[in-house]
Amino acid sequence: MSSHGNSLFLRESGAGGGCLQGLQDSLQQRALRTRLRLQTMTREHVRRFLRRNAFILLTVSAVIIGVSLAFALRPYQLTYRQIKYFSFPGELLMRMLQMLVLPLIVSSRVTGMASLDNKATGRMGMRAAVYYMVTTVIAVFIGILMVTIIHPGKGSKEGLHREGRIETVPTADAFMDLVRNMFPPNLVEACFKQFKTQYSTRVVTRTIVRTDNGSELGASISPPSSAENETSILENVTRALGTLQEVISFEETVPVPGSANGINALGLVVFSVAFGLVIGGMKHKGRVLRDFFDSLNEAIMRLVGIIIWYAPVGILFLIAGKILEMEDMAVLGGQLGMYTLTVIVGLFLHAGGVLPLIYFLVTHRNPFPFIGGILQALITAMGTSSSSATLPITFRCLEEGLGVDRRITRFVLPVGATVNMDGTALYEALAAIFIAQVNNYELNLGQITTISITATAASVGAAGIPQAGLVTMVIVLTSVGLPTEDITLIIAVDWFLDRLRTMTNVLGDSIGAAVIEHLSQRELELQEAELTLPSLGKPYKSLMAQAKGASRGRGGNESVM
């Protein structure tokens, strides 16, 4: 309690008549201090706040204006061409961000791996893998729990409107394509193409020769020997004449090598990891390459600093254009509306509950200021619907806004934007069970477990591009024998849900970077000491060896997380 409060209580105990006067003096002093603080805030703090949060305020304002503008223009029923013209500024933002994704993934991953020793890389890689697996499994569990409790698929699917067409992809081919894309045969081609199995039909003709008694002719006719009599020869001839020759032709679907447009981010990440590890192992011989990629990464981030000022304008027109493209807003109601609500509740529980809780339990810090620091990245994710396109903004928010170590962001974010898809995993598991519900298909525990495992694995293969979850959902449905054509029932709202799950993906990547940084403080400090104090010679080396030995002794009883 303040001294004014103490003097007030003293006056209360000494003289009852002075109590009211003391209370009045105390209130006047507090009011004066509050008035002075408000005056100071209006002159300095508000200006500093606006300057520090200009990007966030502009982006939030762009979202509000975009939604309002879209609903104001909907009564005019713009044509598809007019909507595309209207959305052109948003398309420019997408192209700018996608232009930076390729050099940013390669440069950040190479520098991140080259700046760490092999032991530190191994420990941080294990922590990242555990974090990715734990959060993805939790997301799948939340999705299954929500769709089981709310049961949005109750009723018939006859009232649901179908949109589009879904290509059926065998599960084995999809996972083989994932592994193939990890090892691109041509790095130049990997910059704009991915391997994708395609299918063609061929006519197969088979000739079947059967005898009249249904057996194949085969060795039933043999050349006559001298011991055979005329009767046996006649029997063989009769049997040969009684054979039937049948030609059967049928079509067969066969897999053939193909490709799909888009950056093979997974293959580039794998190559960049290996290349960065090799450069880091070369020590001083690899310094030139390390400096090159570090300078490239710095140049890309400066370009991001320029493009970020255009982001609010692009987000405004992206969101407005998508709302204008919706033919019927009524699809958000009824049975499909319950499905949409179920997905939103699940994503909110994971993004607003589980991920902040993990951050708090590991770092013992309030997670919500951290989430506020990446708000612009989250809004950009909502506008672009692509975690890869949001990657430049995410780097800037974490490194410059929140001060996360660059070695961690370069190590974690490119991989996270490719394989850590919490929102996608939750969505795929929930959507698969929803489709089972609308078909009145009862799933047993084994099938639900299969959906969980398949959704977790398929989310890893979902590239950070818009609506990739619809493609990987085919794998989940095929695993339990559900009709893949029923994916068309939920396409009408996928454009909206895709933005929400992309925000969840970006939030999961960002919190993962903060968690791994907190757990890797000892390795980062030792690595920084080795890089900044090399001139101390042998005494320094012996001191660092002792520090490493003590670190291993303390860390031997610790878990990876």
From Swiss-Prot:
**What keywords does the record list, in alphabetical order?**
Amino-acid transport, Cell membrane, Chloride, Glycoprotein, Membrane, Metal-binding, Phosphoprotein, Potassium, Sodium, Symport, Transmembrane, Transmembrane helix, Transport
Q: Where in the cell is it found?
A: Cell membrane
- Residues annotated to bind L-aspartate: 385-387, 424, 465-469, 498, 505
GO terms assigned for molecular function: glutamate:sodium symporter activity; high-affinity L-glutamate transmembrane transporter activity; L-aspartate transmembrane transporter activity; L-glutamate transmembrane transporter activity; metal ion binding; monoatomic anion transmembrane transporter activity; neutral L-amino acid transmembrane transporter activity
Pfam families noted in UniProt: SDF
Q: Which GO terms describe its cellular component?
A: glutamatergic synapse; Golgi apparatus; membrane; membrane protein complex; parallel fiber to Purkinje cell synapse; plasma membrane; postsynaptic membrane; presynaptic membrane
Which residues does the annotation flag as glycosylated? 213, 229, 236
Q: Describe the intramembrane regions by residue range.
A: 368-398, 448-481
Binding-site list for Na(+) 2: 418
Q: Residue positions of the PTM Phosphoserine?
A: 2
User: What GO terms describe the biological role, i.e. biological process, of this protein?
Assistant: establishment of localization in cell; L-aspartate import across plasma membrane; L-glutamate import across plasma membrane; L-glutamate transmembrane transport; neurotransmitter uptake; regulation of membrane potential
Between which residues do disulfide bridges form? none
**Membrane topology, Cytoplasmic segments:** 1-52
- Catalytic activity annotated for this protein? K(+)(in) + L-glutamate(out) + 3 Na(+)(out) + H(+)(out) = K(+)(out) + L-glutamate(in) + 3 Na(+)(in) + H(+)(in); K(+)(in) + L-aspartate(out) + 3 Na(+)(out) + H(+)(out) = K(+)(out) + L-aspartate(in) + 3 Na(+)(in) + H(+)(in); D-aspartate(out) + K(+)(in) + 3 Na(+)(out) + H(+)(out) = D-aspartate(in) + K(+)(out) + 3 Na(+)(in) + H(+)(in)
Q: Identify the residues that bind Na(+) 1.
A: 416, 420, 505, 509
Q: Which membrane topology describes this protein?
A: Multi-pass membrane protein
Family per record: Belongs to the dicarboxylate/amino acid:cation symporter (DAACS) (TC 2.A.23) family. SLC1A6 subfamily.
**What's noted about domains in the record?**
Contains eight transmembrane regions plus two helical hairpins that dip into the membrane. These helical hairpin structures play an important role in the transport process. The first enters the membrane from the cytoplasmic side, the second one from the extracellular side. During the transport cycle, the regions involved in amino acid transport, and especially the helical hairpins, move vertically by about 15-18 Angstroms, alternating between exposure to the aqueous phase and reinsertion in the lipid bilayer. In contrast, the regions involved in trimerization do not move.
What is its biological role?
A: Sodium-dependent, high-affinity amino acid transporter that mediates the uptake of L-glutamate and also L-aspartate and D-aspartate. Functions as a symporter that transports one amino acid molecule together with two or three Na(+) ions and one proton, in parallel with the counter-transport of one K(+) ion. Mediates Cl(-) flux that is not coupled to amino acid transport; this avoids the accumulation of negative charges due to aspartate and Na(+) symport.
Tell me, how does this one assemble?
Homotrimer.
Protein name per its UniProtKB record: Excitatory amino acid transporter 4
The organism is: Rattus norvegicus (Rat)
Read off the lineage from the record: Eukaryota, Metazoa, Chordata, Craniata, Vertebrata
